[in-house]
Regions:
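Catalytic core segments in nucleotide and nucleic-acid processing enzymes
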Residues: 1-54, 273-393
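Terminal, charged accessory segments of proteins
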Residues: 1-240, 256-274, 278
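Helix-loop junctions and short alpha-helical segments
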Residues: 249-256
Length: 393
């Protein structure tokens, strides 16, 4: 997995192969303009474009002194990052993409969303849709939520496999005589042929192994199977995986078995499609991440019932407003929040602070105009107002 950072100007020679046709060079530099993900078949790897908020304020470094070029190969063996930095980049990369993916699903017609046709989300609960990265997240989530299921399957698959089939062993194997007693060094157990249930498990664990080893997403997996790796797994990603899964599909009926099969099939269907193309055909990118950030915060704290007063009469727009208990008397009052898409260490400007005071004054005026309920906000005896907390995120 390759890591790029929004807003940073890279030397063209450093990232030209990574960016492909997604970014244009100017004066020998390529500036990353979007946040999100794409798979580049030229380098055979996923590329994550991170939000610029990890930039050190007032500097051209990131995460406390790293260069953007250091972070490009954060998950390679020659990386300059220590374990803590690498873990942060991994978690932040996945968090950023999940945020973008959720926004794109909820705002399919937004002009800031740029995605491939193959990455469209399906409304069917049974299907696995989105980009390759969405499929990978679905695989990891299924594994983490169903570890008891995997242990149960593995236990059942291997029960009885260590029992020796003495009739076949005596008929087909030559013993060694020791002190007049035959000793069979090579025995035949009761496993007669490929078990299709086990083949599905081998395929699934091989996918997890590939994700962990090649994409920089660490997944702690305990598995005793002989996994599909190297050139053989490459063949699976180029079409053999779909063929094998179609051959054993008839074996599965339970919901979890079918879900496991669908996840494996979706993975190989995605990889075979994007690797056979010469162009970048699997991507999900956002042109204005500050809008995504604001939407995410508002989904967490905003009050949908108050969305109508966000656009104020003086033309100003509140980012977040909600009702919550006053720390003074416990009555419900209004809280106003402002989302700031800043670099690490940046300070809030005087203009932003002034706007917050204006928002609070407008809230008071709305009470006079009858736009807001006055219960718990204005004291009927003194006609004084409870305070209006303002904060920045």
């Amino acid at each position: 997995m390759k890591i790029l950072i929004e807003g940073h100007s890279y030397q063209q020679s450093r990232v030209e192969d990574i960016c492909g046709d997604f970014e244009t060079a100017e004066n020998g530099c390529i500036k990353v303009s979007k946040v999100g993900y794409f798979f580049n078949p030229t380098i055979g790897d996923c590329v994550i474009c991170l939000p610029k908020v990890i930039k050190d304020h007032g500097k051209e470094t990131y995460l406390g002194g790293l260069s953007a070029e250091d972070i490009v190969d954060a998950f390679s063996s020659g990386s300059h990052l220590n374990d803590t930095q690498r873990e942060f980049v991994q978690n932040f990369s996945l968090w950023s993409y999940r945020t973008i993916s959720t926004f794109a699903r909820l705002n399919a017609d937004s002009s800031i969303v740029c995605r491939s046709e193959s990455s469209a989300f399906s409304n069917s609960e049974d299907s696995v849709s989105g980009t390759l990265l969405d499929v990978i997240f679905a695989i990891i989530e299924f594994y983490n939520r169903n570890k008891d299921y995997f242990m149960y399957i593995i236990k059942n698959l291997h029960s009885g496999y260590d029992r020796i089939n003495w009739r076949k062993t005596i008929s087909h194997k030559t013993p060694i005589l020791q002190d007049g007693s035959p000793i069979y060094v090579d025995v035949i157990n009761r496993k007669k042929q490929i078990n299709f249930d086990e083949e599905l498990m081998v395929i699934f664990y091989s996918i997890l192994n590939y994700i962990s080893g090649n994409l920089g997403i660490m997944i702690p997996v305990e598995c005793n199977y002989d996994l599909i790796t190297g050139a053989q797994f490459e063949a699976y990603m180029e079409g053999l995986g779909e063929t094998r899964l179609n051959a054993i599909k008839y074996k599965y009926f339970s919901d979890k078995d079918l879900k496991l099969w669908n996840l494996c099939y979706a993975f190989f269907h995605k990889t075979s499609g994007i690797q056979s193309s010469n162009d970048i055909s699997d991507f999900l990118l956002i042109g204005s991440f500050e809008i995504v950030f604001e939407s995410m915060i508002d989904a967490l704290i905003g009050d949908p019932d108050l969305s109508g007063i966000k656009s104020m009469d003086d033309g100003k727009i509140i980012d977040h407003i909600f009702r919550y208990h006053s720390p003074i008397d416990g009555k419900d009052i209004y809280y106003i929040g402002d989302s700031k898409y800043y670099a690490i260490g940046a300070e809030i400007g005087d203009g932003s602070i002034y706007k917050q005071f204006t928002y609070a004054k407008n809230i008071i005026q709305y009470h006079f105009n009858g736009k807001l309920e006055t219960s718990g906000y204005r004291d009927t005896l003194t006609e004084g107002y409870n305070f209006t907390p303002n904060f920045f995120i």
